[in-house]
């Protein structure tokens, strides 16, 4: 039996045990995971450094290396995320609706686990723990398929989590890492309908497209983040500058970083914003008017408006009004996160009604599109589709429902 099928069998069996556990049993297991990750951090960082060294040798971009790297600070955040998930209410068993029919049948809709979730992701070892903690909390088993570039890190993290589970009610086979990262095995995983209930791809456009186009297992699609900020005519100067700097520079390599800033042509502080960005080392690519007016702005191509840079590069454009900004976002956006900075409430309402995106912001950075920032604990991904879940996906997004019907002998006669 192949590694894939062997682990899929184990996961399916483990999911049946998981579905029967109490919230207390699952929370105790998550606390054990947090403690063991903390205790084994030296081993985890050592294995991560092997991936980092290989990545540098292979010429991975700074953005990819940043996503790949684990540090003590990032491990602290990962461990805190596990504990935050443990502290959240367990959605499993929640009665969503309840009613009684005229014939006396009492019907309940309750929340239940999905079953076995397949995670497909790139060089993001934090996803290994985030996904596992969310899945275990919701009674789901999880098959993790990371990238070759993060294999040492992922093996270490999964080994540590499995060690932690050995003293808990959750079987250690509820978490499995697919160590064969070949394309052929991935394609087989995408068609494992008898074992996997859903696939969740998390990564770049190529990875997501590959899963969506090749999977027969249902896909909960996450999307790339070509995020925009529209600085309206009434935007307050310092607020606008601080929001744009945060959205671009706090962590440029993530999907909720801003990639294009649209500036109202009558906003009086455009020069201040652009010069500040330039001084902070941001490469600016602008429309013809901006490229002509500022020697440090190169002229943008059509491709620039579509690009998720994941780097300190920013496309900038002057627009006549909120409607032109909305039109630009409709054409080039990826329905992820879009923001408007303005003191004009009419324009806020227009922007919120007209822009189709998972998350919309007024006077705030796009960087808040994140499960932890939304209060979900760690996130399984950020969905840009409209069915089942949209936006940062926390616990509820990886559950489904079933109906429980209580009778007293009723039979159907019509």
From Swiss-Prot:
Coiled coil: none annotated. GO terms for molecular function: glutamate-5-semialdehyde dehydrogenase activity; NADP binding. It is found in: Cytoplasm. One of its GO terms (biological process) is L-proline biosynthetic process. The keyword Amino-acid biosynthesis applies. It is an enzyme of class 1 (oxidoreductase). Its main location: cytoplasm. Keywords: Amino-acid biosynthesis, Cytoplasm, NADP, Oxidoreductase, Proline biosynthesis. Its EC number is 1.2.1.41. InterPro entries: Ald_DH/histidinol_DH (IPR016161), Ald_DH_C (IPR016163), Ald_DH_N (IPR016162), Aldehyde_DH_dom (IPR015590), G-glutamylP_reductase_CS (IPR020593), Glu-5-SA_DH (IPR012134), GPR_dom (IPR000965). GO terms for cellular component: cytoplasm. Pfam families: Aldedh. It catalyses: L-glutamate 5-semialdehyde + phosphate + NADP(+) = L-glutamyl 5-phosphate + NADPH + H(+). The keyword Heme does not apply. It comes from the Bacteria. Pathway: Amino-acid biosynthesis; L-proline biosynthesis; L-glutamate 5-semialdehyde from L-glutamate: step 2/2. PANTHER family: DELTA-1-PYRROLINE-5-CARBOXYLATE SYNTHASE, GLUTAMATE SEMIALDEHYDE DEHYDROGENASE. Belongs to the gamma-glutamyl phosphate reductase family. Catalyzes the NADPH-dependent reduction of L-glutamate 5-phosphate into L-glutamate 5-semialdehyde and phosphate. The product spontaneously undergoes cyclization to form 1-pyrroline-5-carboxylate. This is Gamma-glutamyl phosphate reductase. It comes from Geobacillus kaustophilus (strain HTA426). The gene is proA.
């Amino acid at each position: 039996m192949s590694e894939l099928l062997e682990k899929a069998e184990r996961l399916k069996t483990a999911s049946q045990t998981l579905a029967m556990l109490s919230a207390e049993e699952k929370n105790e297991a998550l606390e054990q995971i947090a403690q063991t990750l903390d205790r084994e951090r030296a081993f985890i960082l050592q294995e991560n450094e092997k991936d980092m060294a290989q990545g540098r040798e292979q010429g991975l971009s700074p953005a990819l290396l940043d996503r790949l790297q684990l540090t003590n600070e990032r491990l602290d955040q990962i461990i805190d995320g596990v504990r935050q998930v443990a502290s959240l209410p367990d959605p499993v068993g929640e009665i969503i609706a309840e009613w009684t029919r005229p014939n006396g049948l009492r019907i309940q809709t309750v929340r239940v686990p999905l079953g076995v979730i397949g995670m497909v992701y790139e060089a993001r070892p934090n996803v290994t723990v985030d996904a596992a903690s969310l899945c275990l909390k919701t009674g789901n088993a999880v098959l993790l398929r990371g990238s070759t570039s993060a294999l040492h890190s992922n093996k270490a993290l999964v080994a540590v989590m499995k060690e932690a589970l050995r003293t808990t009610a959750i079987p250690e086979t509820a978490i499995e890492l697919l160590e064969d990262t070949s394309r052929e095995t991935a394609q087989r995983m995408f068609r494992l309908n008898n074992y996997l209930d859903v696939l969740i791809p998390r990564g770049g456009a190529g990875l997501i497209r590959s899963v969506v186009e090749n999977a027969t297992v249902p896909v909960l699609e996450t999307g790339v983040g070509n995020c925009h900020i529209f600085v309206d005519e009434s935007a307050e100067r310092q607020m606008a500058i601080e929001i744009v700097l945060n959205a671009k520079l706090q962590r440029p390599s993530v999907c909720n970083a801003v990639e294009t800033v649209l500036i109202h042509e009558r906003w009086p502080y455009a020069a201040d914003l652009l010069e500040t960005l330039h001084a902070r080392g941001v490469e600016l690519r602008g429309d013809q008017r901006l490229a002509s007016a500022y020697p440090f702005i190169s002229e943008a191509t059509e491709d620039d408006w579509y690009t998720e840079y994941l780097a300190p590069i920013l496309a900038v454009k002057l627009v006549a009004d909120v409607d032109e900004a909305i039109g630009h976002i409709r054409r080039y956006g990826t329905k992820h996160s879009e923001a408007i900075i303005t003191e004009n409430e009419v324009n806020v309402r227009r922007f919120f009604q007209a822009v189709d995106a998972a998350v919309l912001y007024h006077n705030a950075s796009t960087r808040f599109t994140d499960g932890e920032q939304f209060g979900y604990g760690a996130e399984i991904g950020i969905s840009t589709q409209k069915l089942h879940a949209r936006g940062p996906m926390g616990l509820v997004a990886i559950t489904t429902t079933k109906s429980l019907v209580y009778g007293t002998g009723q039979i159907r006669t019509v």
